[in-house]
Amino acid sequence: MEQGQNKPDEIFSCTRIAEFQNYLHQEERSRNTITKYIRDLKVFFTFLDGQPMDKEALLDWKKHLTQTHAPASVNSMLASVNKFLDWLELPGLKVKPLKIQRQIFSNPKKELTTEEYRRLIKAAENRLLLQTICSTGIRVSELKFITAESAKTGRAEADCKGKTRIIFLPPDLCRALRHYCRERGIDAGIIFCTRNGCPLDRSNIWKDMKMLCDSAGVEPGKVFPHNLRHLFARTYYALEKDLSRLADLLGHSNVSTTRIYTMESGLMHSRQLSRMGLVFTRT
């Protein structure tokens, strides 16, 4: 084979990945989901490096992933390849995910507190953007549905992941959004967008939030857009103790997913144990 020519297996993988990507589009999967699947598949085919795609190769890849990735990441990547194998009608090649014990407590190094959130808001140039995400619990991908019209009605209709749901906007937020729109001459359409009028994406917001860490005095590991959604969930659950209604507000079809969002670091449990006063020995 001449230099520069692709090997047959490389042509196969590229062609099949492209066809699979088209299939995901037809399934109306979200852009982020499709990007994730395709990225994982490319990693898998790079690992194969021309080897036959058989059960042994899949098990080798799983073993390799366990040595280089966290268990949750391993399962996520295996799920991408298993989806591809289902599409190829090769279910016999699918590999089982790792068994992970359900976490009861969250990592305290990633739990954003209300006080830390206040400091981020104080340090932010566009404070209303962060408050909009945190006070509604929306995904960053749903920010484009927060419009001048929704600021007037107090609700936005979001079409995400093939499902339509209603996002409720608190009255205080609506007033702030309407004032924001008046100042910027926004009469209709998306409120938070780029200079070109395109919706802000996760990378835009992630970068801006990371720049606030030093001035706000908050650990970088706690500062990312999705953590605002987690803070919303924990705050709501602490007030209402209604997991089912919280699932509706977050747009979850499975309450088990919602339960993950309400996990605490365990610091409160530790304080409660300390108040019991059952240790008398002092050092």
Language model region names:
Residues 1-283:
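Conserved catalytic core of the tyrosine transesterase superfamily
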